[in-house]
Amino acid sequence: GVQVSEMILGCWVMGGAQWGGADDNESIRAIHAAYDAGINTLDTAEAYNDGYSESIIGKAIQGHPNYYSILSKALNCYSKYDQLKAACENSLKRLGRDYLDVYFLHWPSHFYGGKKVPLEETMAAMSELKKEGKIRAIGLSNFSVEEFKIAMEVDRVDVYQPPFNILW
């Protein structure tokens, strides 16, 4: 299975668009300092400044990409089969890796005004990505229990991030 550190470094701020932004070099130093402190798991998403957070991580782990466990998330607007597969490839390119340790569906397709795509179609793409070795584990983030059950009918959901944030 996927090995993650007890603590995970959240990388939403890296990329500069939200939470006041962050300097790229400071972000890279933070990733290296976290690794030195025993934190080798990085949580990101293509939604974090249009993939720029993933690009910063890619720069930080260059030369040692497999020292880290990387968790990333697909935008809900890429819920169709081909869109999701392409989104994963784009994340891998930005990160400079051949695989993601965990790839999450960030939100159900219909959130934020998105067009509803059958979860079975989206999960079929996730299952194929796993079979291809592009992802090691399938994750859901911000999905209901009912949606979780539908997803599990297609393939095993390995990781679940419930919709909880102490700031909201």
Question: Could you describe each region identified by the protein language model?
Answer:
Residues 108-168:
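Beta/alpha (TIM)-barrel catalytic core signal, keyed to glycine-rich beta->alpha loops juxtaposed to Asp/Glu
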Residues 4-8, 40-41, 67-71, 99-104, ...:
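Structural preference for beta-strand elements that scaffold enzyme active sites
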Residues 92-113:
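Active-site groove signature of glycoside hydrolases
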Residues 13-25, 72-82, 111-116:
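Active-site mouth loops of central-metabolism enzymes
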Residues 12-14, 45-47, 73-77, 105-110, ...:
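Active-site beta-loop-alpha junctions enriched in small/polar residues
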Residues 1-68:
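N-terminal binding-site loop/beta-alpha segment at the start of enzyme catalytic domains
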Residues 33, 37, 56-64, 94, ...:
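Alpha-helical structural signal in soluble globular domains
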